[in-house]
Amino acid sequence: MPELQLRGGEVDGLRLHYVVEGRGPAVILVHGLGGFAETWRHNIEPLARRATVYAVDLPGFGASAKPRSRYRLANFASALRGFMDGLGLAQASLVGHSLGGAVSVTYALTHPSRVERLALVGAVVPGCSFRPSWAFRAVAIRGLGEIASSFAWAGLYKACLARCFHLPDRAEIDFFVDYRYADRTEPEARAAYLSTLRDVRIDMETHAHDYRRAMTTLELPMLLIHGRQDRVVPASHCDEVAALVSHASVRRVDACGHFPQIEHAEAVNGWLVDFLVGRPAPR
């Protein structure tokens, strides 16, 4: 798994791990809260038939560095800018899942000339109505989150993951929990997870109006993919996002929870390839 050390500004020296495959237009896959690059493993190869696909571990997650710093959306967007700069990518299309959607939107709003197309999968976008589950709200409480993460991290993670799927898939849940377990359960990883929960909540609550207003200015092509049975980010959230932008296409997925790219990978891959490069991938 390649590693890139970022240069310049607030991200100077930050190490990001990533997966890269394929040749063609650049596409960056941005995972959600608690995710990592390999959570896109059902999607990378089909997309790589027509594009150069980069799946990145965001700061604080996967095998990337986990600094003791802020984990606001602007910080993640700065890391994404540094990632593109380090790879020499003047422009790329972004595919963001869940929190990765909020990161991708933030980057598109602050660096519009560098984003060619934007696909949001089960994404949460600041400014549109969203209420985290009681479990996420509880873990975000200082002290309580630290206690829970110290004594029941794997169990808590599994319980949250089960809620993410329309029909819980034990193999997928076990993969999320077990893959690079040491990297994602070390104290620095738990601290980064909790900091992200708390810092992004500030963005969601204090900058909602700014995001709603800014979203109406986005001119780039946008694809929204959302599971009808998503219990993490309700499908109505996707409808709100679509109403704010003028160039959005929407794909609603039946019998699907918060992970369309896993639960209905074949359909989602077809939509993404067609949207990102303009023609379906070969069978």
Model features per residue range: what roles?
Residues 247-283:
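Catalytic active-site module of serine/aspartate enzymes centered on a nucleophile-bearing elbow/loop
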Residues 11, 19-21, 54-99, 131, ...:
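Active-site loop/oxyanion-hole signature of alpha/beta-hydrolase fold enzymes
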Residues 1-27, 49-51, 89-90, 273, ...:
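Alpha/beta-hydrolase fold catalytic core
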Residues 16, 151-214:
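Conserved alpha/beta-hydrolase catalytic His-Asp/Glu region
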Residues 229-233:
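Acidic catalytic loop of the alpha/beta-hydrolase fold
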Residues 14-63:
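Conserved HGGG/HGGXW glycine-rich cap/lid loop of the alpha/beta-hydrolase fold
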Residues 109, 117-150:
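Flexible "cap/lid" loop of the alpha/beta hydrolase fold
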Residues 218, 224-226:
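Short beta-strand/loop motif that positions the catalytic acidic residue
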